[in-house]
Amino acid sequence: KYYIMKWLSDYVREFGIDGYRVDTVKHTNEDVWKDFKKVCDQAFAEFKLNNPDKVLDKNTPFFTVGEVYGYGISGKQIYDFGDKKVNYFQNGFTSLINFDFKGDANKSYEEIFSNYDKILHQDLTGKTVMNYATSHDDGWPFDKERKRTYETATKLLLAPGISQIYYGDETGRKLII
Protein backbone atom coordinates (compact mmCIF):
# COMPACT_ATOMS: atom_id res chain seq x y z
CA LYS A 1 0.00 0.00 0.00
CA TYR A 2 2.85 2.41 0.77
CA TYR A 3 4.32 1.94 -2.70
CA ILE A 4 1.05 3.16 -4.24
CA MET A 5 0.84 6.06 -1.78
CA LYS A 6 4.40 7.08 -2.67
CA TRP A 7 3.69 6.82 -6.37
CA LEU A 8 0.53 8.95 -6.19
CA SER A 9 2.04 11.50 -3.80
CA ASP A 10 5.00 11.92 -6.17
CA TYR A 11 2.53 13.33 -8.73
CA VAL A 12 1.40 15.82 -6.09
CA ARG A 13 4.96 16.74 -5.14
CA GLU A 14 6.18 17.07 -8.74
CA PHE A 15 3.17 18.52 -10.57
CA GLY A 16 1.12 20.17 -7.85
CA ILE A 17 -1.95 17.97 -8.24
CA ASP A 18 -4.27 19.39 -5.59
CA GLY A 19 -6.72 16.54 -5.12
CA TYR A 20 -7.76 13.00 -5.89
CA ARG A 21 -11.09 11.28 -6.45
CA VAL A 22 -10.96 7.78 -5.03
CA ASP A 23 -13.20 5.03 -6.43
CA THR A 24 -14.60 2.12 -4.38
CA VAL A 25 -13.35 3.52 -1.07
CA LYS A 26 -15.17 1.01 1.10
CA HIS A 27 -13.28 -1.96 -0.35
CA THR A 28 -10.16 -0.99 1.60
CA ASN A 29 -9.68 -0.52 5.33
CA GLU A 30 -10.61 3.04 6.23
CA ASP A 31 -7.31 3.77 8.00
CA VAL A 32 -5.52 3.43 4.64
CA TRP A 33 -7.23 6.61 3.44
CA LYS A 34 -6.22 8.53 6.54
CA ASP A 35 -2.59 7.58 5.89
CA PHE A 36 -2.97 8.42 2.19
CA LYS A 37 -4.33 11.89 3.00
CA LYS A 38 -1.41 12.59 5.36
CA VAL A 39 1.11 11.59 2.68
CA CYS A 40 -0.62 13.78 0.07
CA ASP A 41 -0.91 16.73 2.49
CA GLN A 42 2.83 16.56 3.08
CA ALA A 43 3.59 16.28 -0.65
CA PHE A 44 1.30 19.23 -1.45
CA ALA A 45 2.99 21.36 1.22
CA GLU A 46 6.38 20.49 -0.30
CA PHE A 47 5.17 21.43 -3.79
CA LYS A 48 3.92 24.79 -2.52
CA LEU A 49 7.17 25.48 -0.69
CA ASN A 50 9.31 24.58 -3.72
CA ASN A 51 7.08 26.25 -6.35
CA PRO A 52 5.71 29.50 -4.92
CA ASP A 53 5.24 30.93 -8.43
CA LYS A 54 2.87 28.06 -9.35
CA VAL A 55 0.71 28.17 -6.22
CA LEU A 56 -2.77 29.55 -6.83
CA ASP A 57 -3.82 29.65 -3.17
CA LYS A 58 -1.27 28.90 -0.48
CA ASN A 59 -3.99 28.21 2.11
CA THR A 60 -5.96 25.62 0.14
CA PRO A 61 -5.38 22.12 1.54
CA PHE A 62 -5.10 18.92 -0.50
CA PHE A 63 -8.60 17.73 -1.47
CA THR A 64 -9.95 14.19 -1.45
CA VAL A 65 -13.34 13.02 -2.68
CA GLY A 66 -14.39 9.44 -2.15
CA GLU A 67 -16.93 7.18 -3.79
CA VAL A 68 -18.45 5.15 -0.97
CA TYR A 69 -21.21 3.42 -2.90
CA GLY A 70 -24.52 4.14 -1.20
CA TYR A 71 -23.34 6.99 1.05
CA GLY A 72 -25.84 9.83 1.27
CA ILE A 73 -25.78 13.23 2.93
CA SER A 74 -28.68 12.08 5.11
CA GLY A 75 -26.18 9.83 6.92
CA LYS A 76 -24.21 12.96 7.79
CA GLN A 77 -20.70 11.77 8.69
CA ILE A 78 -21.52 8.08 8.98
CA TYR A 79 -21.67 5.27 6.46
CA ASP A 80 -23.50 2.24 7.84
CA PHE A 81 -22.24 -1.14 6.62
CA GLY A 82 -24.89 -2.94 8.66
CA ASP A 83 -22.37 -4.59 10.96
CA LYS A 84 -20.27 -1.48 11.57
CA LYS A 85 -20.40 2.27 11.03
CA VAL A 86 -17.52 4.24 9.52
CA ASN A 87 -16.80 7.96 9.40
CA TYR A 88 -14.83 8.41 6.18
CA PHE A 89 -14.59 12.15 6.79
CA GLN A 90 -12.45 11.37 9.85
CA ASN A 91 -10.44 8.94 7.74
CA GLY A 92 -8.96 11.28 5.17
CA PHE A 93 -11.83 12.49 3.00
CA THR A 94 -12.79 16.11 2.44
CA SER A 95 -15.84 15.08 0.42
CA LEU A 96 -17.92 12.02 -0.44
CA ILE A 97 -20.15 11.41 -3.44
CA ASN A 98 -23.76 11.95 -2.36
CA PHE A 99 -25.91 9.08 -3.60
CA ASP A 100 -28.99 10.73 -2.02
CA PHE A 101 -29.14 13.57 -4.52
CA LYS A 102 -30.70 11.66 -7.42
CA GLY A 103 -33.68 10.85 -5.19
CA ASP A 104 -33.71 14.18 -3.40
CA ALA A 105 -33.94 15.92 -6.79
CA ASN A 106 -37.63 14.92 -6.78
CA LYS A 107 -38.16 17.31 -3.86
CA SER A 108 -38.73 21.07 -4.08
CA TYR A 109 -35.81 23.45 -4.50
CA GLU A 110 -36.39 24.86 -1.02
CA GLU A 111 -36.48 21.44 0.60
CA ILE A 112 -33.26 20.27 -1.07
CA PHE A 113 -31.30 23.49 -0.60
CA SER A 114 -32.38 24.10 3.02
CA ASN A 115 -31.73 20.51 4.08
CA TYR A 116 -28.31 20.29 2.42
CA ASP A 117 -27.29 23.72 3.73
CA LYS A 118 -28.27 22.74 7.27
CA ILE A 119 -26.37 19.43 7.17
CA LEU A 120 -23.27 20.96 5.57
CA HIS A 121 -23.12 23.77 8.13
CA GLN A 122 -24.03 21.76 11.23
CA ASP A 123 -22.98 18.15 10.75
CA LEU A 124 -20.34 18.38 8.01
CA THR A 125 -18.64 21.67 8.90
CA GLY A 126 -15.43 21.96 6.91
CA LYS A 127 -16.43 19.04 4.67
CA THR A 128 -18.67 18.75 1.61
CA VAL A 129 -20.46 16.32 -0.68
CA MET A 130 -20.42 15.85 -4.43
CA ASN A 131 -23.94 15.61 -5.89
CA TYR A 132 -24.87 13.83 -9.10
CA ALA A 133 -28.06 13.19 -11.06
CA THR A 134 -26.79 10.41 -13.34
CA SER A 135 -23.81 8.07 -13.29
CA HIS A 136 -22.44 4.99 -15.03
CA ASP A 137 -22.57 3.26 -11.63
CA ASP A 138 -26.27 3.86 -11.17
CA GLY A 139 -29.21 2.44 -13.09
CA TRP A 140 -31.74 4.69 -11.32
CA PRO A 141 -30.84 8.26 -12.24
CA PHE A 142 -32.98 11.32 -11.76
CA ASP A 143 -34.93 12.07 -14.97
CA LYS A 144 -33.95 8.93 -16.88
CA GLU A 145 -36.11 10.03 -19.85
CA ARG A 146 -34.35 13.43 -19.94
CA LYS A 147 -37.64 15.34 -19.89
CA ARG A 148 -36.59 17.65 -17.04
CA THR A 149 -33.11 18.73 -18.13
CA TYR A 150 -33.42 22.36 -17.02
CA GLU A 151 -34.73 21.31 -13.62
CA THR A 152 -31.94 18.74 -13.32
CA ALA A 153 -29.28 21.30 -14.20
CA THR A 154 -30.70 23.96 -11.91
CA LYS A 155 -30.97 21.66 -8.91
CA LEU A 156 -27.59 20.05 -9.52
CA LEU A 157 -25.67 23.27 -10.07
CA LEU A 158 -27.33 25.29 -7.31
CA ALA A 159 -27.56 22.65 -4.58
CA PRO A 160 -25.04 23.13 -1.77
CA GLY A 161 -22.00 20.96 -2.40
CA ILE A 162 -20.04 20.10 -5.53
CA SER A 163 -21.74 19.22 -8.83
CA GLN A 164 -20.62 16.12 -10.73
CA ILE A 165 -21.58 16.39 -14.39
CA TYR A 166 -21.87 12.99 -16.05
CA TYR A 167 -21.21 13.05 -19.78
CA GLY A 168 -24.46 13.94 -21.46
CA ASP A 169 -26.01 15.72 -18.47
CA GLU A 170 -25.17 19.05 -20.04
CA THR A 171 -26.76 18.19 -23.41
CA GLY A 172 -29.66 15.97 -22.40
CA ARG A 173 -27.98 12.93 -23.97
CA LYS A 174 -30.29 9.92 -23.95
CA LEU A 175 -29.87 7.44 -21.13
CA ILE A 176 -32.28 4.86 -22.51
CA ILE A 177 -30.80 2.96 -25.42
Where are the predicted features?
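Active-site-proximal helices and loops of the catalytic beta/alpha 8
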Residues: 7-16, 21-132, 144-148, 154-159, ...
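Short secondary-structure junctions and interdomain/linker hinges
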Residues: 139, 160-163
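Acidic/polar loop patches that form or flank catalytic/metal-binding clefts of enzymes
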Residues: 163-169
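Active-site neighborhood of divalent metal-dependent phosphoester/pyrophosphate hydrolases
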Residues: 133-140
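Active-site mouth loops of central-metabolism enzymes
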Residues: 1-2
